[in-house]
């Protein structure tokens, strides 16, 4: 559904979509599912082809003794199906706008710090169901690769929060 709506919206980020679908109102979801049924089938088919082909490639590589290493970023993009589908898992306000975003503090490498702009997780919310979103994410990644590296793993034990809308990372904490 996400990609079908995104295509119909001219590839605009989901947080710029019409309010009803941006906020995932049940009546809007139903309407868009019906309106985009053919496109949804297309995206399902394309994903099926990818996973079939990737599975064959991985099997061939493994048979030849080659292990595939994957790299999963600690944070997901704001403009992603993950954030749109599960906004309660991210530090967003009542309008689904980030309150704080990810980055790194200023240091010798960068006097302004690094402003990545990804929405931060609501770990307290994720803990309520045993971090099932994370477990599903890792499990899905591990079906594609033999070894998975989490990029900026340190983000699991601490993070740097920057007020949303800031031009640099200087005001983070």
Give residue spans per PLM region:
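Conserved, well-ordered alpha-helix/loop/beta-strand core segments that scaffold catalytic motifs
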Residues: 43, 48-76
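Alpha-amylase-like alpha-glycosidases and glucanotransferases acting on alpha-linked glucans and related
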Residues: 1-51, 76-173
């Amino acid at each position: 559904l996400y990609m079908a709506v995104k295509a119909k919206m001219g590839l605009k980020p989901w947080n710029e979509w019409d309010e009803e679908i941006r906020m995932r109102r049940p009546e809007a979801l139903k309407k868009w599912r019906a309106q985009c049924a053919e496109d949804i089938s297309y995206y399902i088919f394309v994903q099926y082809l990818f996973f079939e082909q990737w599975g064959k490639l991985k099997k061939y590589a493994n048979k030849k003794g080659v292990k595939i290493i994957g790299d999963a970023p600690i944070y997901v993009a704001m403009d992603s199906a993950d954030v749109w589908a599960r906004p309660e898992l991210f530090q967003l306000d009542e309008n689904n706008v980030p309150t704080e975003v990810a980055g790194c503090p200023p240091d010798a490498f960068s006097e302004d710090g690094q402003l990545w702009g990804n929405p931060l997780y609501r770990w307290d919310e994720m803990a309520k169901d045993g971090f099932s979103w994370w477990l599903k994410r890792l499990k899905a990644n591990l079906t594609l690769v033999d070894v998975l590296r989490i990029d900026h793993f340190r983000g699991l034990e601490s993070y740097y929060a920057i007020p949303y809308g800031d031009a640099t990372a200087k005001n983070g904490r």
